[in-house]
Amino acid sequence: MEALIPVINKLQDVFNTVGADIIQLPQIVVVGTQSSGKSSVLESLVGRDLLPRGTGVVTRRPLILQLVHVSPEDKRKTTGEENGVEAEEWGKFLHTKNKLYTDFDEIRQEIENETERISGNNKGVSPEPIHLKVFSPNVVNLTLVDLPGMTKVPVGDQPKDIELQIRELILRFISNPNSIILAVTAANTDMATSEALKISREVDPDGRRTLAVITKLDLMDAGTDAMDVLMGRVIPVKLGIIGVVNRSQLDINNKKSVTDSIRDEYAFLQKKYPSLANRNGTKYLARTLNRLLMHHIRDCLPELKTRINVLAAQYQSLLNSYGEPVDDKSATLLQLITKFATEYCNTIEGTAKYIETSELCGGARICYIFHETFGRTLESVDPLGGLNTIDILTAIRNATGPRPALFVPEVSFELLVKRQIKRLEEPSLRCVELVHEEMQRIIQHCSNYSTQELLRFPKLHDAIVEVVTCLLRKRLPVTNEMVHNLVAIELAYINTKHPDFADACGLMNNNIEEQRRNRLARELPSAGSRDKSSKVPSALAPASQEPPPAASAEADGKLIQDNRRETKNVPSAGGGIGDGGQEPTTGNWRGMLKTSKAEELLAEEKSKPIPIMPASPQKGHAVNLLDVPVPVARKLSAREQRDCEVIERLIKSYFLIVRKNIQDSVPKAVMHFLVNHVKDTLQSELVGQLYKSSLLDDLLTESEDMAQRRKEAADMLKALQGASQIIAEIRETHLW
């Protein structure tokens, strides 16, 4: 019966030697209402007076009590020094380190002092546990937890929600699936009102780990007994119901020993419950608890075995990553260089062994930069951004020189469209920079995840990082130059014969023709009414005549781009069509710039430029022709409006063609001059820079803590293998 628990304690000690708390040993948690006899039951199991006793609330902090069985011959225990203590039983607290207590009165006093230190001296309760280990030849190997008793009404310094606090504290301990619940209920209370059984069923509804203990059998009313309760006829408990007799307060005051109490308990049971005496009492409770603990440990063994195997595999892998001491430095260096270069290229290709799941990295991020970041940035560039009407008119006038232009010069279109195309260079260079940064990040990714062997040799790691960084740094200006040339190529020749550009011009011609027809249909009625009222040809009407409503609305508008209306023919004074006919438009963009004489006359009639000079020169300052002219806001003429509109449409059409070319060619250039070049030359560059006999000893110098890490991993692996062997022995020898 006692053979299994020492093995589990030994297993726990194996992990404690390496500073790990891996296995949760099954605990026996004692719960019950206040003054139900929980501490008395624990004292009976220990066999000594070591817990504070009294009326009211006494246990105000959880007490984790570990009972350790020792042989009667093993009396001398040392504290790690030459001097030790000579005792048959002793105790040790966690908070007092290696101090040993041979007087159990001192243990009880230390529990009271430690309780008051945290919880105060006025019935306060604290969830912080007290750890006590008791060594004795009179106990079996058990771990018990004594909890504060459940109460309803706060007293002393207890908060108003003391009932809820204690309930949460109890649930925290009994919710552990590896615990056995000892539900203590007094025999002089109704079993149906047991708070201990009620809270136990909340976490253990099947009753698979709940054992009921009935205390105070000797305090029942005269003429009554607990026969029905002990036999499970009132409330059945799956693991059983055990009755015990505790010492009374008078017995404690009279210094009655636990041994005498157990002897008197046996006599009482033989007298009152002779048929149940062999299945009740403190000794039977201890044996039952030990048996339940054994079965519970047996059920936990498969999980413990699995956890140990997983940890052993992890530490074995860690030890392998640390590697063995280097024998052939030349081969080791070449192997590490080759492995790093392979992992670097695999990370770009997406075939690396260690793939990130939390974020994009490597080739996936480069793809995201090309098609998401760079693509969206180019699409956000406005083809007409930074251009206004004044800029366009100024470019047109500067391109014509001193001569008035009959058509819009092509030079102005090229000048303006080149200005817009140049705006694509900055996001293209930024794309190169982002790809360069990602390739820098791949270095760190490979160092951390893919080639952990490099962590053994920090100097080699730093040298590899430096070589790859220099290689990337050398390729950066080459790639930037190529991207700059791609933009320069587009600027070098404006291809107005581009198929997409010709199609766009033809479509715009059709749109303008449609706009002319629509405007003519709207203006003919207004022109006819004006002829009847003024009797003057509309083309020669005085400038002072008010324009029709449509023209007035036009006059109020600002200098913005819109679809300017043009007439197809000008009506004569008699209502007929004038001599000015429409010239046919051509298929290229020059056809958009032609106009008819009637259109010019109508434009002059509709809007006269606002005079810039003062009406009375005598009253103003003298005009100096050498002064720089100041731009004056005025309404554009119909021709100026049309010229601006045509130029804007042409710029937008050609800009979209160039943007499409840049969006396609820049990623290709980056891949060829930066990414693929680095992939192809990385290994040869690393070998050429680092694979030298003069650098072997320096590069393959291990870090100072690597040997310590290797030793710790080996010790942990050895401890895990020992634990696995112990579990195998338990399974083969004791359980199956």
UniProtKB/Swiss-Prot annotation:
Glycans are attached at residues 585-586. There is a cross-link at residues 532, 535, 558, 568, 594, 597, 606, 608 (Glycyl lysine isopeptide (Lys-Gly) (interchain with G-Cter in SUMO)). Changing residue 59 to A: Abolishes GTP hydrolysis. Its EC number is 3.6.5.5. Residues 502-569 are annotated as: B domain. Residues 448-685 are annotated as: Interaction with GSK3B. Residues 215-218 are annotated as: G4 motif. Residues 344-489 are annotated as: Middle domain. The modification Phosphoserine is found at residues 529, 607, 616, 637. It is found in: Cytoplasm, Cytosol; Golgi apparatus; Endomembrane system; Mitochondrion outer membrane. Residues 644-735 form the GED domain. GTP binds at residues 32-40, 215-221, 246-249. Keywords: Acetylation, Biological rhythms, Cell membrane, Coated pit, Cytoplasm, Cytoplasmic vesicle, Endocytosis, Endosome, Glycoprotein, Golgi apparatus, GTP-binding, Hydrolase, Isopeptide bond, Lipid-binding, Lysosome, Membrane, Mitochondrion, Mitochondrion outer membrane, Necrosis, Nucleotide-binding, Peroxisome, Phosphoprotein, S-nitrosylation, Synapse, Ubl conjugation. It is an enzyme of class 3 (hydrolase). Residues 654-668 are annotated as: Important for homodimerization. GO terms for cellular component: brush border; clathrin-coated pit; cytoplasm; cytosol; endoplasmic reticulum; Golgi membrane; late endosome; lysosome. Residues 245-248 are annotated as: G5 motif. Residues 146-149 are annotated as: G3 motif. It catalyses: GTP + H2O = GDP + phosphate + H(+). Residues 22-302 form the Dynamin-type G domain. The modification N6-acetyllysine is found at residue 597. Functions in mitochondrial and peroxisomal division. Mediates membrane fission through oligomerization into membrane-associated tubular structures that wrap around the scission site to constrict and sever the mitochondrial membrane through a GTP hydrolysis-dependent mechanism. The specific recruitment at scission sites is mediated by membrane receptors like MFF, MIEF1 and MIEF2 for mitochondrial membranes. Belongs to the TRAFAC class dynamin-like GTPase superfamily. Dynamin/Fzo/YdjA family. Homotetramer; dimerizes through the N-terminal GTP-middle region of one molecule binding to the GED domain of another DNM1L molecule. Oligomerizes in a GTP-dependent manner to form membrane-associated tubules with a spiral pattern. Interacts with GSK3B and MARCHF5. Interacts (via the GTPase and B domains) with UBE2I; the interaction promotes sumoylation of DNM1L, mainly in its B domain. Interacts with PPP3CA; the interaction dephosphorylates DNM1L and regulates its transition to mitochondria. This is Dynamin-1-like protein.
